[in-house]
């Protein structure tokens, strides 16, 4: 978020009256394009392209928070845009947009920078190299149901597909059915596997993998279904009601299901009896990595650490400088941010100004120590 008007606060859409809704007709709650947490808004692609797939990569020197790949369902192509300002990515040898062989409906970027997309109903997968634009052919299901909806990946770069009423499919572009490595993941020939819904009626849609070796699918009939990512063994079903289209993992390990009936449900996978449901408004809909957990754990692993430092108890404290020391492996970096407030309660205010970021990099100059007095 950026303080564009320089008033020392972040002005972003919020629930000002405490009724658990953001009223789009109330200018004190909904800021529209003046929301300072909107980085940019761009029209992507040709008219009628129908954007139905979006994934964020690990970024580059110019866009360290990631670049965005937008898949056009009707025109069967992907546009790569810079995360910083939404302009088209321009690289030597990269033709942008990138033509692919099917209609993308959901996309992910793996840890090696390959962009993968599923499609609606047919079960096919197509990938391409985000650096060069070199694309695979259409990878068709082998020995598994040719059905698809939601699309995600796990920590081993295996691709998962919600196979509608036929459970879930998994495709490994890096290993064949005998476990042998595949040198070129775009060449095809990877292992396909399927796991059923355990005899239950189901309709599998969006999905998200957690950090504990499990993957969670939105079951449109009852709620959520979990599997082990390595064995594809079914863990169980969790009822939050019908109409669930999206499944996501948050950074505290809870599993969230988004239901088109106007609510979201939260599951504690370590306590199956702790299932909560909250009304959120009319027709919420998603089937992708809506929490960013997959991006920050599988595509571009990152972590965070927060620390509160208190000033002198009996005297006023002026915070002047932020300094730090770190041991960094090659090609890694740390970003520092700081907030200053009169009390701990004020620190939690989302509108409080954040200083920074300042970067300490293993491969380049450092911006630490940093000035807090400005």
Task: Name each model-derived stretch.
Residues 33-45, 87-98, 134-142, 179-198, ...:
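A short beta-strand motif characteristic of beta-propeller blades
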Residues 63-71, 79, 114-118, 158-162, ...:
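Conserved beta-propeller blade signature
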Residues 82-86, 128-134, 172-177, 228-233, ...:
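Short loop/turn segments that connect beta-strands within beta-propeller blades
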Residues 251, 259-261, 266-374:
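Beta-strand-rich ligand- or partner-binding modules
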Residues 1-34, 181:
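Acidic, glycine-anchored loop motifs typical of Ca2+
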Residues 59, 73-75, 119-122, 156, ...:
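Short loop/turn segments immediately following the C-termini of beta-strands
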Residues 146-237:
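Eukaryotic tandem repeat interaction scaffolds
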Residues 34-59, 99-110, 144-156, 198-210, ...:
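Repeated scaffold domains used in trafficking and secretory/extracellular systems
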